[in-house]
């Protein structure tokens, strides 16, 4: 769980095993699509992202999350970044602040929030961790998808290059008054890849150069969701932290 390994760490607690966080994305990072959204040709990636955030009330789809690294000195440099870890699964969200990030392969793990608390369920460990959501969603990449529609309140959106068939938008966290570093995010760069008005990828880079890439597919927008979709009750005998 890498791209979101650190993403989840920001949401929950650094004391929780790293493996459990590979299912977050950025929070970050997780974005959805809809054929009902119409965007003008040539519209900037930043404006496409703003419109997507404004128009998406609920959504669900599939994700692939990869942790990448540069090749070492004794490895071939020809193939570029190497995949260190990869997870796959399903995600659901409902604004404001509700989501399920359901990792299904290579292990089963869920990150759930109803807007009030965050729950991390690890099936292999038979363990559920509960944390207060608080301002976490507003100050992390999760705000891109799961928060309210005020994306510009927390980030400056800067149009970047066209790459891999997408228009990339850099999200620069706005400085938070009375904090030493201006923000608590563990990333030096947060980018969203837009294509035809739809967010297709989320890329997170930390100070050590580690890259987490989340790609999204089979997205359905503004779907009807049952009220209990964002609740979770640990099974009998599970450890609760």
Question: What spans do the regions from the language model cover?
Answer:
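Bacterial N-terminal signal peptides that target proteins for export
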Residues: 3-26
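Bacterial N-terminal signal peptides
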Residues: 24-34
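Short N-terminal segments immediately surrounding and downstream of signal-peptide cleavage
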Residues: 42-58
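A mature extracytoplasmic/lumenal domain signature
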Residues: 65-67, 95-97, 103-107, 115-117, ...
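N-terminal mature ectodomain segment of secretory-pathway/periplasmic proteins
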Residues: 54-115
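Gly/Pro-enriched, hydrophobic low-complexity segments
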Residues: 42-43, 129-131, 153-156, 160-241
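Acidic/charged, solvent-exposed loop-and-adjacent secondary-structure segments enriched in E/D, K/R, S/T
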Residues: 120-146
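Sec/Tat signal peptide C-region and signal peptidase I cleavage site
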Residues: 36-40
